Amino acid sequence: MLLEMLNPMHYNITSMMPEVMPVATMPILLLTGFLLLVWNYEDTSSIPGPGYCMGIGPLISHCRFLWMGIGSACNYYNKMYGEFMRVWICGEETLIISKSSSMFHIMKHSHYSSRFGSKLGLQCIGMHENGIIFNNNPTLWKAIRPFFTKALSGPGLVRMVTVCVGSIITHLDRLEEVSNELGYVDVLTLMRRIMLDTSNILFLGIPLDESAIVVKIQGYFDAWQALLLKPDIFFKISWLYKKYEKSVKDLKDAMEILIEEKRHRISTAEKLEDHMDFATELIFAEKRGDLTRENVNQCILEMLIAAPDTMSVSVFFMLFLIAKHPKVEESIMKEIQAVVGERDIRIDDMQKLKVVENFIYESMRYQPVVNLVMRKALQDDIIDGYLVKKGTNIILNIGRMHRLEFFPKPNEFTLENFAKNVPYRYFQPFGFGPRSCAGKYIAMVMMKVVLVTLLRRFHVQTLQGECIENMQKKYGLSLHPDETNNLLEMVFVPRNSEKCLER
């Protein structure tokens, strides 16, 4: 009996608690422990940013991205917390960086070559471990990229000049198709059709309905922007994402019909052309077993949507800037006359068009279309003194960086900003390094071709003094004009008309 009384296991510890501990003490200890965990979590990162605050911080930051759009949210947080700061997206730590030294480090190194985004969202649009734009399968991405690089450089780039000039002339001769009853030109639609037509001739080579495909591309792009950062729960509520799923399916179905026609032509051709285009190269890679049919279809889709999605909007913004800055237009026209004269532009003119080139650069700096780059850290690293852990998401706010460092008049549109050579670490419209834009060279050449060919023929004017600064825009994955605005059309005045000659 005595031994049992001395044995601590003899007692019911739970029943003894009230005797040795006040009732309120346990909740206080639990709360203290929880707050200590939260405090320790926040203390693990010295990077500026909103507080964790028992999980409320991550929830608020993700909601802000969904509500404001990626671009606006990034600018908000950089302005609030500095040029190297931390938030959370989908509960994952995410850095937003607009500091040139940090961007240079990230773009330079291969352990930042992966991107991030909702897996379910990327699966819905066909980009999860597929294509090139958001493909995070490093082995497949490395196998696919050479097809894009080959098609977008060398002989393909040279051929693009002739093809693009022909497409522009054809579409300018049919301006009534993209003009309203007052003769105002829907420039966005015009540019999208030119870009799609040029891309199709170069990379696929199958006749298509430009008008219908352009609409489907816009639907696909809207779905891409909407789904990229959505939480997983969004995809469990079918009525929320069905319209986006349909938009993706519409474009994929249309593209599949075109690609099947391409396969048929290849299989029935007696002799292949000496120069195989992008689609043919991919289809032969599929026949060798290097790629799947799904890989081929997604790569061709991405190749055809790239220019109508981004470059067309870039040229649209450029034409608005030209309309507002007559002295810039005058300088451009003098150079065009001196270099090109009355003939069509050629590939050997490109290096001589310095004013046009600086205008393109300044337009992309002042009013970017793609102003964000999304990456993921594949290993632990130190960036500008901050520890960046493996798996950390990173958004490079390039558009903001272009207005913070180096340029003498960062908040003005002026060619003075490119009067001197700009070190490439301070100006990255296409990125650089292992994951830079595969089409950066052909994009520059194509924009020169479009501007020279169009401006030789027309002087452009906006409606009611509409300008870039006052234009309603959507700040998402890329920056686009709000197309519900009624003042996005332009007036094209023929250069040889009396109205233009009187200027």
Curated annotation (Swiss-Prot):
Keyword NADP belongs to the record: no
Family annotation (Pfam families): p450
TM helices/strands, residue ranges: 19-39, 51-71, 303-323
Binding site for heme: 437
One of the GO BP terms on file: female gonad development
Tagged with keyword Nucleotide-binding: no
Domain of life: Eukaryota
Binding residue positions for substrate: 309, 374
EC number: 1.14.14.14
Job of this protein: A cytochrome P450 monooxygenase that catalyzes the conversion of C19 androgens, androst-4-ene-3,17-dione (androstenedione) and testosterone to the C18 estrogens, estrone and estradiol, respectively. Catalyzes three successive oxidations of C19 androgens: two conventional oxidations at C19 yielding 19-hydroxy and 19-oxo/19-aldehyde derivatives, followed by a third oxidative aromatization step that involves C1-beta hydrogen abstraction combined with cleavage of the C10-C19 bond to yield a phenolic A ring and formic acid.
Protein name in the entry: Aromatase
